Amino acid sequence: MAVNKITVEDFLLLSKNLLVLDVRSPGEFKHAHIPNAYNLPLFNDEERAKIGTAYKQQSREEAIKFGLDFFGPNMRTLVENVERIVAGYGEGVSSLRLRVTGLDNPKKNISTIKKNKAVVKDVQVFNPQPATSQPPTILVHCWRGGMRSAAVAWLLDLYGFKVYTLIGGYKAYRNWALEQFAKEYNFRIIGGYTGSGKTLLLHALEKENNAIVDLEGLAHHKGSALGALGNPPQPTQEMFENLLAEKLSTINHQPSTTIYLEDESQRIGNLQIPIQLWYCMRKAPVYFVDIPFEERLNYLTDEYGIHPKEKLVNAIMRIQKRLGGLETQNAINFLLENNFKESFRILLHYYDKWYTKGLYNRENAENLIKNIAATLVNTEQNIELIKLNNI
């Protein structure tokens, strides 16, 4: 079998149902990668560094020889690692469900898809089978679509796998990801002061078959000083962008497709919403769910009062400069006295002030913002109020 080189669009098309192997080093993969890819490093971080040094200080040929020294003894291990990954990956994946851009009729058969996308010919889908069945198709990429992916693809092809490699490698994928943020989207923004349950509203809309993008979920952060509590560590900026681009690309958006997001500042924890996408959000209608202060305070106390005091104190200290020395100390003292509600009252006043400033700091704000008066942090009731306001 021959190794096939395919474009990033075709690579992503097939990746919906096929195994993606990223053969870059563990450090490169950890920094950022194509979502749902598996790391099968041809070289570890130390080996990659040695090869790079040889390339810079000696020659390309010497660097290749170093690479062969590392690659040769590991060929069997690489193949066996792929077999283990395939065995785990195959569970639960039983059919090929190709989503091809431009084919609006779901009844189009595979032969039609082959005609439009020749790349899918002879694809063997992951399907739990006896050990004697034909090995499935595998997608392989490295940084620039060069020697690393070529070497692994050659080895796996030799062993019997059907292999596709990505033209331009991960770098081509990154260019594709950044292109997603330059597109125009028909956004609708769910707004509300801190403690309004906006994320719950967003996912309630999703359950009713509306398209959403949960920026805070992708960022592993709820946006405020307390937003990291209860969340896993944030991804890198690059990985956040990859996740966001993938999410946007899965929404079959036509110009009329509505996508709901929460109202956010450009910064979510340590991450930044890509500037072009954020500008698009700032031009979108905002449905501001206006809930009384005390109701939101009760909700916030219930949500965050369960966390250890030490973590709460550390979170408050991170905004000390903006909160002010006196208010910071008061908020911490209330925490130490187990008076969570009064501590959070100070924080909520602070965030209400800053949210109001950000809410109206957009062009044409008076026409974009629709105020929706609500009495409780109640997802079911507030979704109905949103519907009454013609979202």
Short names for language-model regions:
Residues M1-P35, A63-F66, F70-T77, N105, ...:
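Flexible, polar/low-complexity N-terminal or interdomain linker segments that lie immediately upstream
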Residues V20-R24, A37-L40, V213-D214, Y260:
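Short hydrophobic beta-strand that contains or immediately precedes a catalytic carboxylate
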Residues E91, R97-T101, Q129, P135, ...:
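Short polybasic linear motifs
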Residues G146-S149, N186-K207:
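Glycine-rich phosphate-binding P-loop
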Residues F161-R174, D214-A219:
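A short glycine-rich beta-strand->turn/loop micro-motif centered on a GG-aromatic cluster
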Residues K207-C280:
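Conserved nucleotide-sensing/catalytic segment adjacent to the nucleotide-binding pocket
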